UniProtKB/Swiss-Prot annotation:
It holds the Pfam family EFP. Transmembrane segments: none annotated. Involved in peptide bond synthesis. Stimulates efficient translation and peptide-bond synthesis on native or reconstituted 70S ribosomes in vitro. Probably functions indirectly by altering the affinity of the ribosome for aminoacyl-tRNA, thus increasing their reactivity as acceptors for peptidyl transferase. GO terms for cellular component: cytoplasm. This is Elongation factor P. The gene is efp. One of its GO terms (molecular function) is translation elongation factor activity. It comes from the Bacteria. GO terms for biological process: peptide biosynthetic process. It comes from Alkaliphilus metalliredigens (strain QYMF).
Amino acid sequence: MISAGDFRKGVTFVMDGHPYVVIDFQHVKPGKGAAFVRTKYKNLKTGSTREEAFNPSDKFPRAHIETKEMQYLYNDSDLYYFMDNETYEQVPLTLVEVEDAIKYLKENDSAIIKFYEGRPFQVEPPIFVELKVIETEPGVKGDTATNVTKAATVETGAIVYVPVFVNEGNIIKVDTRTGEYMSRV
């Protein structure tokens, strides 16, 4: 059991027979009245999100999540196929299940897939990925007074803001948690 007072981002719990993951939370202690935990959470089966205030002493059973490292193979219209590295079984996932992770995955990259009751529900890309810049504007000479950035499209289609010295064809390191440029490779 987990109490609402122990909610943190990424904590999973079961409420009314449905599994949820905490997306965001805020402990609130008003001047008058009892403290509460304002929580934004997502249903792991349907993908829908809700916001609700809980009493910190409210208790919920934990949702047991299984994780597997899998390899991203390819996408076919609306489905993204991942292969289990141990059994070689292919698992198709929808765009809702892969969410923003697909912006940072190239074919044959590894990712962590989370399962609840044998059903995949979330993809976590590696924390840092190396991607090739395929389109960006050339840097303007002399435009270095401050940390100037420009938009760059990488090979997966994601847009990353990079310093002006990064050019097309460069390979850059990106933090997938924030989508920020880290360095040139």
